[in-house]
Design a protein with these regions (language model features):
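Phosphate/pyrophosphate-binding active-site segments
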Residues: 1-6, 286-406, 516-519, 523-526, ...
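A short, small-residue-rich loop immediately preceding and capping a beta-strand
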Residues: 25-29, 51-54, 72-111, 270-277, ...
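Glycine-rich, acidic loop regions that bind phosphate or pyrophosphate groups
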Residues: 108-155, 241-362, 495
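Glycine-rich, anion-gripping cofactor-binding loops and their flanking helix/strand elements
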Residues: 67, 71, 79-82, 88-89, ...
Length: 557
């Protein structure tokens, strides 16, 4: 910083002050020269506990860290970068946030517009880089005077925050800074900053009336939340809730909905499908919605491109339920939910508790019991065993995150209902940024007054390798659980697998990798456990005091 007053600093102070006074709590700063006024002031705000500061070297990881915090808290997190390629590295998180409907504030310090087409160093075209994925773009010219800087910083901050909340997505703020890039700020100016609440956003709502009746089905996808479960009960409707929908629980939950949806005994009775959010995990929903005579109502949740399975699907913001759902449920939802639970129990790989065996007293019988228990503990881990064990170990005060791999689909079809917080980047379902997102969720969940829980990320080996540098971000109780089946085994289900050259398919589609996860963990100072058996998995899941990487060698895909 210099003693010469910098309009960049004046703008940055007004910008950050306005965000803090309007409910923003977290800022992620990436290193750089052009953004120094924002970065240095963010540190000052953090010293006074006005903001929580997160410093991240990798802009791609920074974007996903901010995304995770916004997903968990509902508050837009701020990401600050310098100019040039650093901005482009935010793009994966931006498009994921857009398709999820998650608010973010992206602040990319730029050189003045006059040098953009003159080949200036570290200068490119920030504006428009995120295309339609940015719900709003503010290209802010350099302030001419300190008064202009203060006015512009405050106005842009409030407008950008309001846009991100109202339109539920990422907003790009591109301030053009000129020298001097920073200056000292009197310490007493921070005394005037008072943290506030997020502004209230009022939206016009389109509301659909739905009557409880046999034939109504509720589908809960990305972003649905607990209201989907309540609507299912009010309507007396079976609930097809994806595992990360926020509605995978309750008496109407049909866990094997992939089978039920195509069962003629069920499908022929379907008259209305209420879809909340965007389903992403099963192919049976589209055909069910496309059946002749089926009315489709989609309750969108702010996602960038709402789910529209048919041209006649109605897009609404809310529902009003009428009729006697209890009477309908006894005939319609409860029988199918009960059949689903019975089918799940029949398929379960979890061993039943041998209560009788544990009570025997003679030596031979107790030895037999101990031998059987030991055999159970020595069973190799399968995908189903992994997700079920993690599911059973997770409580309402914990957070469970699924990466983009076959494991989330296994969980979606095998775990029973349970009211826990489950997240997954299903906007675009990419393998990038999964570890950083989980850390963001973990950080945001550790708020004063909240019970201290553990965040568990269940991730495939490819996604873990792809986001390995985000291991540097890990703090607090978080488990990175890597299901290692040596490559993208989810693609083994593709039709092309039956006709492609096996060696070529293995090399360019499954792409197996030889990753030393023990070495990766050591490089970032994280404890590591290798798990091959049920007993080892059970033990590893109890190690929750600090970050840990658990590599689970899977017997199957």
């Amino acid at each position: 910083m210099t003693d010469v007053e910098s309009n960049a600093t004046g703008w940055s102070f007004a910008f950050l002050r306005t965000l803090v006074e309007n409910g923003v709590t977290d800022i992620v700063v990436c290193p750089g020269s052009r953004s120094q006024s924002l970065a240095l002031l963010a540190a000052e705000f953090a010293d006074r506990e006005l903001l929580t500061l997160h410093v991240v070297l990798d802009e791609r990881a920074a974007g996903f860290l901010a995304l995770g915090m916004s997903i968990e808290s509902g508050r837009p997190a701020v990401v600050v970068t310098t100019s040039g390629s650093s901005v482009a590295n935010l793009h994966p998180a931006v498009v994921e946030a857009f398709h999820q409907g998650t608010p973010l504030l992206l602040v990319t310090a730029d050189r003045p517009e006059s040098v953009r087409e003159r080949g200036g160093g570290q200068t490119t075209f920030h504006v428009g880089m995120f295309s339609v994925a940015a719900k709003g773009t503010f290209d802010v010219p350099p302030a001419a005077t300190p008064t202009d800087a203060e006015r512009s910083g405050s106005t842009v901050a409030l407008d950008a925050l309001t846009t991100a909340l109202r339109d539920r997505g990422p907003v790009h703020v591109n301030p053009q800074f000129i020298e001097p890039l920073s200056s000292n700020v009197p310490s007493n100016v921070f005394d005037t900053v008072v943290p506030g609440d997020l502004p209230e956003i009022v939206r016009e709502s389109v509301i659909a009336d739905v009557s409880a009746a046999v034939g109504v089905v509720v589908v809960a996808g990305l972003g649905a939340g607990a209201r989907a479960e309540k609507w299912a009960r009010d309507l007396g409707a079976p609930l097809f809730a994806e595992v990360a929908s926020g509605a995978h629980f309750g008496p109407h939950l049909v866990t094997d909905y992939r089978t039920v949806a195509v069962n003629p005994e069920f499908a022929d009775k379907v008259t209305t499908v209420v879809v909340v959010g965007r389903p992403t995990l099963a192919r049976v929903i589209d055909p069910m919605c496309s059946r002749t005579g089926v009315d489709v109502i989609v309750v969108h949740v702010g996602e960038g491109v709402p789910y529209r399975p048919t041209d006649h699907a109605r897009l609404v913001d809310d529902l009003v339920v009428t009729g006697d759902g209890d009477a309908v449920s006894r005939e319609w939802a409860i029988p199918w939910a009960r059949r689903s639970r019975m089918a799940l129990d029949d398929r379960a790989s979890e061993p039943a508790a041998d209560v009788a065996g544990s009570l025997v007293e003679d030596h031979a019988s107790r030895a037999d019991f101990a031998r059987r228990e030991m055999e159970i503990q020595r069973e190799p881990v399968t995908s189903e065993m992994l997700v079920r064990s993690v599911w059973d170990a997770t409580w309402p005060h914990d957070r469970l995150v699924f990466g983009a791999s076959s494991l989330i689909r296994v969980a979606d079809s095998t775990v029973p209902g349970k009211p826990i917080r489950v997240h997954s980047n299903r906007g675009l379902a990419g393998i990038d940024g999964n570890i950083a997102t989980a850390q963001g969720i973990a950080v945001a969940s550790r708020q004063p007054g909240n019970p201290v829980g553990v965040t568990r990320l269940v991730i495939g080996d490819l996604a873990a390798a792809y986001d390995a540098t985000s291991l540097a971000l890990l703090t607090g109780p978080i488990q990175i659980i890597v299901g290692n089946n040596n490559g993208g085994r989810i693609f083994e289900g593709l039709e092309v697998a039956a006709t492609a050259n096996p060696e070529h398919f293995e090399a360019v589609v499954l792409t197996p990798q030889d990753v030393n996860f023990d070495g990766l963990a050591a490089a970032y100072g994280i404890p590591y456990r290798r798990v091959e058996t049920r007993g080892q998995l059970t033990s590893a899941l109890t190690e929750t005091a600090e970050p840990i990487l658990v590599e689970v060698v899977l017997r199957n895909g």
